[in-house]
Amino acid sequence: MQAEGFDGPEALRAVEVDPGEPTPGRVRIAVRAAGVNPADAKLLRGMFGRGRVPVRPGSEVSGVVTAVGEGAEGPLGPILVGDEVVAFRVSGGYSAELVAPASAVLPKPAGLGWAAAAGLLLAGTTAEHLVEATRVSSGDTVLVHGASGAVGSLAVQLAVARGARVLGTTSERGEEVVRRFGAEPVRYGAGLEERVRVLAPGGVDVALDTAGIDEALDASVALVADRSRIATVAGFEHAARLGGILMLGGGPGADPGTALRDAARPGLLDRAGRGELEVVLGPSFPLTEAAAALALVESGRARGKTVLLP
């Protein structure tokens, strides 16, 4: 799937492109599933710059290695034809087959399905960045905004695993997911701060925003004494206005946390493969319906991770 310009997801078209043979240090992967992320839509709108066309979105996939270039070695060792793998921070993932740098490729655990594997690493490394940057530790009370979403549900699990008490904002339909991971659901909307104070009268130690809405950060500032323990991966403009809030990820003025996120990849895959982390899966779409998948993700109505299945 590709677009000839920066006119948004609606401009995506299915085309036949031969990925070719991998050059040294690269591998070819037959894609089994591709993660769909808001950043893909931003790329298609030129929000990361208007560089080379065609534009081929998709930064995370799972699949099977079909060819390897000379010296193709991933972070955990050599890569062989037939290996089941996960590739993250690639380009052109909305494909049936692609060539990727071996440095982006890690083994897929046998206990992890294709869709979950494709949806783990962007959300998981983002969640790891959130809990690490805010120093979540045993005994903390942590508020996670958007707790039933792809990033939020993983942040809940990681914080609970560190021994924190977790409160998670969600809609009515997301409450079961929040409870399943050991957190206490809080309905978002007007009066959020007051509802949190019913559960935590003295406020909370940490707030992690994956929702990107102003009320989440406003409530966080009211509930957390130390603003250096409030972090957002989505609400950058409002965070900048409020001041003192950690901005993490790919937004303007945000800390990308590249080294931390790269180091977290093997551990996240291992824990997910052993059933210690669960990727909450949302709807799946055929590759040719990538524009519809992106529309759902951008709407904020998707609960869990949306994936494409070539």
Residue map of PLM features:
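Glycine-rich beta-strand-centered segment in the early N-terminal region that forms part
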Residues: 18-35, 45-91
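Residue-level marker of beta-strand positions
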Residues: 33, 83-84, 97, 141, ...
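NAD(P)H dinucleotide-binding glycine-rich loop of Rossmann-like/cofactor-binding domains
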Residues: 72, 84-146
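Short amphipathic alpha-helix with an adjacent loop that forms part of the alpha/beta core around
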Residues: 192-202
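Short, well-ordered loop/turn sites that connect or cap secondary structure elements
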Residues: 79-80, 136, 224
